């Protein structure tokens, strides 16, 4: 589900990950992970674009973004329900694609699970399926008390 906006944000993401790593922050990559039968699944029937098939180029993290000691979550759907191991006083920032699918889903799940935790999204490090859907997802997250910002917070 790549887009020109997704490609354009990669330098911002790379800089953000370096900033996290330099501070010693916990870095978790999530990978939308599907099988060869994706188009036969309920999700695949509603979003009939074969993507993120485990082991393929579209599934792997963009070259140059991975760092030592990062963690991976291979999630079979938009949102991951097993966000465990965070303290209420942690700050959790999300970046990535697609703003209007995976990012918004996980931001809202995290806010529901950790209501006293600051959950934020850097809009400059996200991209949606379209620019319009990206903006709509950012507004939805703001409505759900997710701190949405651009660049430095």
Tell me the role of every PLM-derived stretch.
Residues 101, 126-130:
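Short gly/pro/ser/thr-enriched loop/turn and capping motifs at secondary-structure boundaries
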Residues 78, 124-127:
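Short, acidic/turn-prone active-site loops that include or flank metal/cofactor-
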Residues 93-94, 109-112, 128-129:
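Metal-ion/cofactor- or nucleotide/acyl-coenzyme-handling active-site neighborhoods
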Residues 51, 55-101:
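Internal catalytic-core helix/loop-beta-alpha segment
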Residues 15-19, 102-114:
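Histidine-anchored nucleotide/phosphate-binding helix
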């Amino acid at each position: 589900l790549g887009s020109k906006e997704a490609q354009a944000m990669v330098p911002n993401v790379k800089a953000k990950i370096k900033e996290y790593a330099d501070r010693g922050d916990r870095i978790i990559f999530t990978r939308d992970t599907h099988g060869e039968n994706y188009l036969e699944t309920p999700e695949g029937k509603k979003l009939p674009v074969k993507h993120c098939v485990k082991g393929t180029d579209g599934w792997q993290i963009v070259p140059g973004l991975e760092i030592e000691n990062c963690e991976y979550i291979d999630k079979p759907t938009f949102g991951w329900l097993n966000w465990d191991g965070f303290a209420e006083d942690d700050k959790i920032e999300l970046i990535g694609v697609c703003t209007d699918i995976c990012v918004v889903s996980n931001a809202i799940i995290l806010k529901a699970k950790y209501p006293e935790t600051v959950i934020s999204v850097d809009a400059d490090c996200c991209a949606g399926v379209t620019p319009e859907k990206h903006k709509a997802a950012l507004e939805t997250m703001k409505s759900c008390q997710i701190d949405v910002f651009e660049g430095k917070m």
